[in-house]
Amino acid sequence: MGNIFDKVNSPEDLKSLNIEDLNSLAQEVRKFIIETVADTGGHLASNLGVVELTLALHYHLNSPKDKIIWDVGHQSYTHKILTGRKKKFHTIRQYKGLSGFPKYSESIHDVIETGHSSTSISAALGLALARDLKNRNDRIYAVIGDGALTGGMAFEALNHAGHLGTDIKVVLNDNAMSISKNVGALSHYLSRIRTDPTLSKFKDDVEVLLSRIPKIGNTVSRSVERVKDGLKYLFLSGVLFEEMGFTYMGPLDGHNIQELITNFKNADNIKGPVLIHVNTKKGKGYKPAESQPSKFHGVSPFKIDNGESKRKKSNFTYSQVFGQTMVKLGNKDKKIVGITAAMPEGTGLSYFKKEFPDRFFDVGIAEQHAVTLATGMARAGMKPVVAIYSTFLQRAYDQVIHDACIQNLPVTFAIDRAGIVGADGETHHGLFDLSFLRAIPNIIIMAPKNENELQHMIYTAINNDQPVAIRYPRGEGYGVELDNDFSTIPIGKGELLCDGKDVLIIAVGSRVYPAMEAARVLSQQGIKAAVINARFIKPLDKNLILNKINECKKVITVEEHALKGGFGSAILEFINENDLRGIKVKRLGLPDRFLPHGPTGHLQTIYHIDKNAIIESALKLVDERVELGLWPGKNA
């Protein structure tokens, strides 16, 4: 790396640099990010787009006294590098390494932890109100993307801040693309401000004209100012934000450090809320990412020369199978519609979008709206499928209850990324959906053991007459052959995969295959385990489970989900409701804490939901000597 990069280890080190130095540093930082993410994987395109913006912010502000809140937070790599974490940057998103998102435990410069979108302005306003109550003078900047700005929470915060007149600055990082291309009226509005040369020139002309209007006396002056304000509202960009009580500045060139610093200084001279509109290019400085920013949003390790992944995928992912199944079903049934909240590629609905654009609806970052939109379609006789990550379904919990389940409407929830998701960590693991869905009347909850079973569950759900949720994991399936024809899975019917009388293993979703492998190993030690693929978390297969529990008396449940309120809890409730006595139960699942980031397989092992954990639990249930370490293959 260059001499400037090596010397910068804190925001304070930027203060002595001139603009030429800052521009050189930007290129060095960009190169460092590309080289590191090529080895580790991570969020690339968004970070390459905000290098100059981040440098300008830290040059202008005095962090951590002054506060920067990064919406979503996946674009905070330059911020991390500048705030003392350069030497640890090679550990980004690795187990026990740096988080890919702002983390207060890592640095006091990460004042607010983020991961989900549209939260930054609310947090910034909270910090600002506390500042004012304490009579402090901290400068508070929220950085939010144009994609995140489509989230309703962002507008709630803008409305409140504008109403209060609180002194906060909101930097709108406008790259015209969040993860996928932005949608909606706001996107079109920002696009017009950003790209319309006529509007830009007219704005300049109006400003010049208004500046020439003379002021004669206080009364006349006030009248003239009102006229000038009226003309501005008629003709100038940024009216939407001005109407909400913000002073609008921009749009600015987000890669021009001098222009950014100058305008940040000007913004600080304005008391009250200011929105600074900045245009950036996602993926800037790396041609593959510039040409395909969606592909380079979140990447696995890749080859720098061509951007191709270093990892070869051998099997279809669950998301791909979901998307392809939607296309097959959509060809046969024109009532099927697909709905997503700004994640068509991630969920696999992009396949459906390509084939049936008129039946595909991307609502932007608006999960609540997505769910209630689906209920309206269901009431009108359509068959809506809402494709959503488990972690983002949390945002629409009230709508699932109030709009879908109370009315018992046939909406299918395709819940992707259910379970451990790996490197994105606490904010993105999908560990709570069973707990919060299981408590709701009228909903059916399923989980497939493999990608073939997933397609049959989708078919079953779409042709059902009540709300159905299907949860499935991130990543590749097992490479099993996919049936050409779809079949209906009887509601509430599990699957006995192997029989035995010594111990019963009831597994859910991604844990079925490890349970089968554990049963095979146990059989080699003379222990006959029965394995049930639950398929349904709600309703349970009461007859199958009751018969096998009574027969085996020793039960293991295993799930890739939080133990509290999860599938194991459902089995305990079932045992209690049926007044079963003398039953030993061991629940395997995830603990009552937020799990860190790290490789999925590694986390499954250290949190004891892998094959070996099932084997050990079975041995302990079957033979009490195991507690003393006396089972076969172990020494006392």
Curated annotation (Swiss-Prot):
Gene Ontology biological process terms, A to Z: 1-deoxy-D-xylulose 5-phosphate biosynthetic process; isopentenyl diphosphate biosynthetic process, methylerythritol 4-phosphate pathway; terpenoid biosynthetic process; thiamine biosynthetic process
SMART domains (alphabetical): Transket_pyr
Cofactor note: Binds 1 Mg(2+) ion per subunit. Binds 1 thiamine pyrophosphate per subunit.
Keyword Ligase: no
Pathway: Metabolic intermediate biosynthesis; 1-deoxy-D-xylulose 5-phosphate biosynthesis; 1-deoxy-D-xylulose 5-phosphate from D-glyceraldehyde 3-phosphate and pyruvate: step 1/1
UniProt cofactor(s): Mg(2+); thiamine diphosphate
GO cellular component: cytosol
Annotated catalysed reactions: D-glyceraldehyde 3-phosphate + pyruvate + H(+) = 1-deoxy-D-xylulose 5-phosphate + CO2
CDD domains: TPP_DXS (cd02007), TPP_PYR_DXS_TK_like (cd07033)
Family matches, as Pfam families: DXP_synthase_N, Transket_pyr, Transketolase_C
Binding sites annotated in the UniProt record for Mg(2+): 146, 175
EC category name: transferase
Chain positions recorded as thiamine diphosphate binding sites: 74, 115-117, 147-148, 175, 286, 367
UniProt keyword annotations, A-Z: Isoprene biosynthesis, Magnesium, Metal-binding, Thiamine biosynthesis, Thiamine pyrophosphate, Transferase
GO-annotated molecular function: 1-deoxy-D-xylulose-5-phosphate synthase activity; magnesium ion binding; thiamine pyrophosphate binding
Assigned EC number: 2.2.1.7
InterPro entries: Dxylulose-5-P_synthase, THDP-binding, Transketo_C/PFOR_II, Transketolase-like_Pyr-bd, Transketolase_BS, Transketolase_C, Transketolase_CS
Residue stretches spanning the membrane: none
NCBIfam families tied to this protein: dxs (TIGR00204), PRK05444.2-2 (NF003933)
Subunit and partners: Homodimer.
Annotated protein name in UniProt: 1-deoxy-D-xylulose-5-phosphate synthase
Organism phylogeny: Bacteria, Bacillati, Bacillota, Clostridia, Halanaerobiales
